[in-house]
Amino acid sequence: MLTKRTHPMIGKISELLVGVNRSTAAPFFDVLMTSPKSPLDFKILPQISQRNSSKRFYDDNLGGSVGLGIVAALENSNTRRITSVCRSEPNQPGRSDPVQFMSHGGSTDGEDEEMFIMDEEDYTLVTCHHGPSGSCNTRVYDKDGFECFSSKINDDRRERLFVVDVVTESPENSPEFQGLGFLNSCYLCRKKLHGQDIFIYRGEKAFCSTECRSSHIANDERKERCRSKFSTSPYTAGQIFSTGVLVT
C-alpha cells in the first residue's frame, strides 16, 4: 500500500530564497512550515489564519509588495525602495502642488522695465529737472538711441532720441569738409559751391558750371601747346659748334 509523502523541503526552499530577513516574513513561513499532514491539521490552519489575520503578510517598508514581490523586495531592501506595479493610490489632499518658478501674474511694467535695463549692455540715463519744484524725470535709452519702455518693445513704439539733422548743421564746419578745401569755391570764378552741383577736373579742381570748367580746360590746352612749341623752337635749342680751323 502506497502512502503519500509529505514535502518538508518546501519550507527550506522558501527559506533559502528569502534568507535575508526572516523576521519580516515570519507569518508567511509559519504557514508554509505547518502544511497539513493529517485531517486533524485542517482544524489548526484556520486558527493560524485567524491568529495572523490582523497582521499583514507584507511590510509597508517593502513598498506594498505581495507574493513573489516580497522576495525581490527583501533582496533589494538595502539598495532601493520597490513599489508594486499594480499599486494605485487615491489622490492625497496633503500633497503640495509643484512649485512655479516663473509667475507673470504679479509682475508689473516697472519690474519688466528694470529687467530689460539689466539685460542691456549699453544704455544711457537721461534725467530732466523741471523748474524750481525739484521734480525730475529719468528716461533710459539703448545704444542705438531708442527709448526703453518695457521688456516687450515693438519697432513702431520706439522713439529715437539722438538724431543729427544734416540740413541744419553746416557742412563747412565739419572736419571732412575742411580737408576738402578745393570744394568750397569755384576754381575759376571763386563762387561758393555750398548746395550746388560741383564739376571736378583732374580730381583737384572744382567748378560751379560746365562753362567755367570748359574755359579752364581751354586755357590749360593753350598753355600746353605753347610749352610744346617753345620746346621744339630752333631758337631755344643749344648752340652747335663745328670743328674747323679759323683762317684770318
UniProtKB/Swiss-Prot annotation:
Its main location: cytoplasm. A zinc finger (FLZ-type) spans 181-224. GO terms for cellular component: cytoplasm; nucleus. Induction: Down-regulated in response to mild as well as prolonged energy depletion. Up-regulated by glucose, sucrose and mannose. Coiled coil: none annotated. One of its GO terms (molecular function) is zinc ion binding. Residues 85-94 have a biased composition (Polar residues). It is found in: Cytoplasm; Nucleus. Residues 85-108 are annotated as: Disordered. It comes from the Eukaryota. GO terms for biological process: response to glucose; response to mannose; response to starvation; response to sucrose. InterPro entries: FLZ12/13/14 (IPR044604), Zf-FLZ_dom (IPR007650). Keywords: Cytoplasm, Metal-binding, Nucleus, Zinc, Zinc-finger. May act as an adapter to facilitate the interaction of SnRK1 complex with effector proteins, conferring tissue- and stimulus-type specific differences in the SnRK1 regulation pathway. Interacts with KIN10 and KIN11 via its FLZ-type zinc finger domain. Interacts with KINB1, KINB2 and KINB3 via its N-terminal part. Belongs to the FLZ family. This is FCS-Like Zinc finger 14. It comes from Arabidopsis thaliana (Mouse-ear cress).
